[in-house]
Amino acid sequence: MALFRDTVQKINAKDYTADQIAVWAGHERSLAAWHASFMKPVALVAVDEAEIIIGFADMASDGYLDRLYVSAAHQREGVGKRLVAALEQRVASPQYKAYVSITAQPFFKTVGYSTIREHRAFIGTTSFRNYLMGKRCECESDWLRAALMT
């Protein structure tokens, strides 16, 4: 949870108000609830040479990418790209979707996602602008995509 909070406070602060950042980073979750929320078909953790966690991501079996966070100290090192690629390799889906922050939208465009629409998310009564983005499977053909889905 520390990496999540630190990333929100240091990276997302340029695109959201101080109040939004405080609510987002301070959103109370029990440690048990946090761990349980990663019980999706694919949850990945990136570590550095010292085995320190520098990023994490998870995706549901329908291709919904729920979370992608990379340590503020490891932004622009390819960690996020490798996590997304690994998720997409492990989850065979005709399309991938994610609700992404204002800050993350340019990154997702670089890995092939397109903006579907602007969205409003809420934590309690605090509103956050984000975007629903999607990407079609880059399977070579429909029969291969169908084979991957079975």
Task: Describe each PLM feature range.
Residues 1, 5-32:
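Conserved GNAT-fold acetyl-CoA-binding loop/helix
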Residues 95-99, 114-132:
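Conserved catalytic-core motifs of GNAT/GCN5-like acyltransferases
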Residues 37-38, 57-60, 83-92:
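Alpha-helix C-terminal capping segments
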Residues 108, 113:
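Conserved active-site tyrosine of GNAT-family acetyltransferases
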Residues 55-62, 66-71, 77:
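Helix-adjacent hinge/juxtasegments
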Residues 70-72, 76-90, 100:
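Conserved acetyl-CoA-binding loop-helix of GNAT-fold acetyltransferases
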Residues 103, 126-150:
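Terminal substrate-recognition subdomain of acyl/acetyltransferases
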Residues 39-55, 60:
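Conserved beta-hairpin
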